């Protein structure tokens, strides 16, 4: 099963990261000044002596998608022998969860003799300050108390909401790659894969990527999928150049109508593809497409196995398992022996799960506010309120109808809100 080329050809060393020399010098100077790092690494890369760099508590790498922000930190950790603790800040949003994951990672010993640890908060601009239950404040608190390097990435960290984060961090801007730099990387990959790629074809891919190297590599892998060993300009024209906007309805239709396995698998290379959203939509659309119980059963079996891989990935951070999950979820669901002939038009409905979450959003927000209020006034954690106190209050309310009124008066909370909570 093919590993995504963005992972296969991810730079293994600091020097291998394409361009971004200024960012490398700043990052290395900060690491060498404030933490331990190999002497030869510091001699080569620690070129900056600015007070702003040396005094920074954390580093925030800023730049458009695909310029190497995350890759730079992976290469840095490998180069200096540090264990990387990586979190996507837009996935782990709450203060409690952030502290739990980071704390566990810092407490646990390493099995591989790393010289230290470095924490990476990826995509911090994915946090929604109001909705995400103290996530931003938690990151700031972790930075202020941390004794290990904290690095963050963001596409656009200059939103006013992230001012507190910028105030305690050194913002390092990574520039968009030139067309020539992207072509050079694509050329090396073609050589490594034993593929004969026309120069104009590579330039076409690079031009449409707009400096996003990750997108360009994904496109190249898509064009050369299925064991193809040649790439011409005509191939690009026939398949079509990058389309950055593909709705979930179009993604589903392409998956179900794919004529062969690699065609379905290649959907994951599209920049619009979101595998978490895909799993939600696929779960509810399989019965719409496959009417026969046997076919439906096979599709669900493969999707559930893919979901098991995703669960393990989230628990262990073994992202090398992702290709296996995507092959099952895309090619596995698409290519079924008893697959029927599909009609010209399939009406895909919007997932009920997402509709329910959207409708209940306000109720859930009110519930969270009430839980927070109870936690502060009773001097317990929010998880304790949810797991213990709400249950006990619910039992008491069933045996004594007046307890809700007494709670309302004692805590100064609307009785209707308390009933909603229970």
Swiss-Prot record:
It comes from the Archaea. SUPFAM superfamilies: P-loop containing nucleoside triphosphate hydrolases. SMART domains: AAA. ATP binds at residues 63-70. GO terms for molecular function: ATP binding; ATP hydrolysis activity; DNA clamp loader activity. Signal peptide: none annotated. Part of the RFC clamp loader complex which loads the PCNA sliding clamp onto DNA. Belongs to the activator 1 small subunits family. RfcL subfamily. PANTHER family: CHROMOSOME TRANSMISSION FIDELITY FACTOR 18, REPLICATION FACTOR C SUBUNIT 1. This is Replication factor C large subunit. The lineage of its organism: Archaea, Thermoproteota, Thermoprotei, Thermoproteales, Thermoproteaceae. The gene is rfcL.
């Amino acid at each position: 099963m093919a590993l995504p080329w963005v992972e296969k050809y991810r730079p293994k060393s600091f020097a291998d990261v394409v361009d971004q020399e200024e960012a490398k010098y700043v990052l290395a100077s900060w690491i060498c000044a404030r933490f331990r790092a190999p002497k030869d690494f510091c001699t080569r890369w620690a070129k900056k002596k600015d007070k702003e760099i040396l005094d920074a508590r954390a580093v925030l790498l800023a730049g458009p998608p695909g310029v190497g922000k995350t890759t730079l930190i992976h290469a840095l950790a490998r180069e200096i022998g540090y264990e990387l603790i990586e979190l996507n800040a837009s996935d782990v949003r709450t203060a409690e969860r952030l502290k739990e994951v980071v704390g566990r990672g810092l407490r646990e010993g390493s099995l591989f003799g790393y010289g230290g640890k470095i924490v990476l908060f990826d995509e911090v601009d994915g946090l929604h300050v109001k909705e995400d239950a103290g996530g931003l404040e938690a990151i700031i608190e972790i930075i202020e108390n941390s004794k290990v390097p904290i690095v963050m990435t963001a596409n656009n960290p200059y939103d006013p909401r992230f001012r507190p984060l910028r105030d305690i961090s050194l913002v390092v801007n990574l520039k968009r790659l030139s067309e020539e730099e992207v072509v050079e990387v694509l050329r090396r990959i073609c050589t490594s894969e034993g593929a004969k790629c026309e120069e104009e074809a590579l330039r076409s891919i690079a031009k449409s990527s707009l400096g996003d190297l990750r997108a360009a590599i994904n496109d190249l892998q898509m064009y050369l999928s299925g064991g193809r060993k040649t790439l011409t300009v005509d191939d690009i024209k026939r398949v079509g150049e990058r389309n950055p906007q593909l709705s979930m309805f179009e993604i589903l239709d392409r998956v179900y109508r794919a004529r062969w396995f690699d065609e379905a698998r290649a959907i994951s290379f599209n920049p619009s593809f979101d595998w978490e959203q895909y799993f939600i939509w696929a779960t509810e659309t399989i019965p719409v497409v496959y009417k026969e119980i046997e076919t439906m059963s096979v599709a669900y079996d493969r999707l559930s196995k893919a979901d098991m891989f995703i669960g393990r990935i989230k628990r262990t951070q073994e992202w090398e398992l992702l290709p296996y999950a995507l092959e099952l979820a895309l090619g596995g669901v698409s290519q079924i022996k008893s697959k029927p002939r599909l009609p010209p038009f399939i009406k895909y409905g919007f997932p009920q799960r997402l509709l329910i979450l959207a409708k209940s959003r306000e109720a859930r927000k009110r519930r969270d506010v009430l839980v927070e209020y109870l936690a502060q006034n009773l001097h317990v954690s929010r998880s304790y309120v949810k797991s213990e106190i709400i249950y006990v209050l619910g039992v008491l309310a069933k045996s004594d109808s007046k307890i809700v009124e007494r709670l309302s008066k004692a805590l100064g909370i609307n009785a209707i809100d308390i009933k909603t909570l229970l």
